[in-house]
């Protein structure tokens, strides 16, 4: 896997786990980086996020992406469409989220999904809706969808500083083309920190400062060995 794990390694289903965390926490925001669009029916996914938002008192966000782990999908018997189809499914999900969260009920017609009457009751508590975060660096499709639909982007540090900057530049161009204020998009990064390995608090702080200088406003770290810290 991307973070060194195979899909066969022990892991919990994300949204079930987040529902548990909603009852244990009071301030933490709860979401997935990121939800692959192929794994859940779009209307069911939005119902899950709405439910999480209500149960957590308005602390849910929807992190979403076009999915990439073909072996996992095949292993679970889930169809793994072409890249074009997955990105079209991503846009269907984003369009549906914007439409459903703006009303109590909506009909939807997309390229890969349609439904005559999807209800949004109870409404999410987040105002105006749970935050939408799109993960990825694709300059033509992904970042255009960020500019058009999302509240935040998420860019992995593993692509390197130069490509991270290129992604932000592409996002800025899409915002200009769509008439959106670039500053209204939250720029988030994702990386892994091993505080029991080669990483230190000081080196991590230096990375955060470098990300801030590039224009990122929120640094998110995966800490797989945090339980080893004593």
Residue ranges: model-predicted function:
Residues 1-230:
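Active-site-adjacent structural elements that line small-molecule/cofactor binding pockets in enzymes
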